Structure formats: structure tokens, C-alpha cells
Amino acid sequence: MVMSKILKIRNVGDYSQWVGHTDTHPLVSVIDYAEVSPVRHCLNNYSVYGIFFHDEANIDLAYGCGKYDYKEGTVICVAPGQIGGKEDNGELVKLTGWALLFHPDLLQGTALEKHIREYSFFDYRVNEALHMTDEEHDILVSLMRQIKDELQKKHDALQDAILVGYIELMLNFCQRFYNRQFITRKLVNSDMLMKFDQLLRDYYEEKIQLTSGMPTVQYCAAKLCMSANYFGDLIKKMTGDTASNYIRQNLIQRVKNELASGANISQVAYELGFEYPQHLNRMFKKFCGYTPTDYLKLIQKKPGC
């Protein structure tokens, strides 16, 4: 049996050495997999950013604690501190497609350094990867080629700024393509929203709130087999509101239903997992503009917020 090991990708050169690619820049590497020889599988622990896509492949990849079947036209983005790849089984694989790796040091002092983690797809699970259309594939390949061409030029005072500009452009395109994916998967996403609602119903029916309090975005995302970032982005696209607000609004409606059925405020606060009635009062007023007591006075005249 082949022993499993994790390769530490401390810099772009470590990855390039693994696949047999020669770099021309210490902080950036673009690899056309068609130009490298077959390699053995390996789990990689990244200290660099990476954007990977394959033209065609059937590879069962690991990412964090999850697995993913790497399909044609799929983009995966990794950030420092993440693990990806496949355990070495002794077989050689011919990778296809492209890879862009860049070290965080390249971004020092740039605007991108400050907001790169705003691209939440770096924290998506691999089974939430971007599936490109043919047009999107061509755009990203074109950018890969432009970065590769720039890397082959003689280094000058502007090269790093140009490279960062290309990288930011690629990230913005990835964000646009993810937005498209959220929209085109509307039917699937609609089913997910129904599952989200059912999850919240089950949470309260099973009295989990009595020991764990209000459900969190992290809890719901995990139950629905998503990363918190992808789940939050998806709910935002579907409802126009954050996942945390969606959970709170669901809770507010439960409070109203309980009050309308004759329960007192302290009883409702306890049943819904609030440590003190004041906590319920504060959240209710924030969302409705008035307190539960005010709601009880208005309930016969004007239901709802």
C-alpha cells in the first residue's frame, strides 16, 4: 500500500516542482497542464492562493473534509491554509487545463490585499465549485494565457502591478460566473430554500433551541452540506437578505404565532431558547419597530409588523 502524505505548498515553486514546471517569477506561476508530464496524486497543504480548472477529468478530489468529482469545466479556488488534492494511490494522472498560483506577498501594499477575502468563493467547499459555460471557459483561458505571456517578459517596475491587475480581473470574472450559476440553478436552489425552512421547523420541534439557543448560519449550512459562505451567498441571491436575518425573521414569526395563541412573553422567550425575556424584546423591537408588549396591544387591529 502506498503511504499517504501531504505536500506543503509553501510557495509557487513547491507546486511547480511537483508537476515539473519551470517558473519565471518567485511569486506567481501559471501552468498549462498540457505542457507537463503525468504526476502521481498528492494531497497539498497550500500557503498560496490557487485557481485551478481542468478541461476534462474524472478525479475524486479531497478538499478539507469533503470529496468532489472533478468534472469538465470546473473551477476551484483555494486560499492559504486549505488542503486539496487526492491521496497518492501509486497511479500517474495526466492533468489537463490550467492552474494559477500566487503568493500573498505579491499583494502587499495593493488594494487587492485588503479585499481578496471578500471573494467568498475561496471559502466554498469543493462540491460548490464553479461550473463554467464554454464562453466562461474561454475567458478564463484567455486570462491565463495573458498572465503567462506577461511572466515570460523581462521583469520591470510595472510587471507586478500588471500581474495583480490580471489576477483581480480573473477573480472578478469568477465572481460574475458564480452569480450566473446561482441564477441558472434557481430550481435547485428553490428546493434548497424549502429544505432550509424545514430545517428550521425541525430545529424548534425537536427543542434544540432549549440547549443551543437560536439556530446559527453555520449550523444550518452544515446540515444542508454547504459551507457557511456559499450558503450565505446563496440565501442572499435568492431572498435579497442575509441568512442570519432570514433565521431571525423566521424566529420573529414564531414569536408572533405564540403570542397570538395566548402565551405570555416570558413563556415564549423560554420556549424559543432566549436566556432572558429582555433578549427577545430587544430582537423583536429591532426587526418590527415595537416590542412584543406593543404587538399584543396591536394584534387585534393590525397583524404583522
Annotate each predicted stretch with a short phrase:
Residues 73, 231, 279-280, 284:
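Short hydrophobic/aromatic patch on the recognition helix
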Residues 1-69:
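Generic protein-terminus/edge-of-domain signal
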Residues 164, 186-224, 245-263:
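A short, Lys/Arg-enriched amphipathic alpha-helix from helix-turn-helix/homeodomain DNA-binding modules
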Residues 138-201:
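An amphipathic alpha-helical interaction segment
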Residues 237-275, 297-305:
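Terminal helix-turn-helix DNA-binding modules in bacterial transcription factors
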Residues 65-79:
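Short acidic-glycine-tyrosine-enriched beta hairpin
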Residues 89-153:
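A hydrophobic/aromatic-rich effector-binding and dimerization subdomain
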Residues 281-305:
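…primarily DNA-binding HTH/wHTH and HhH modules…
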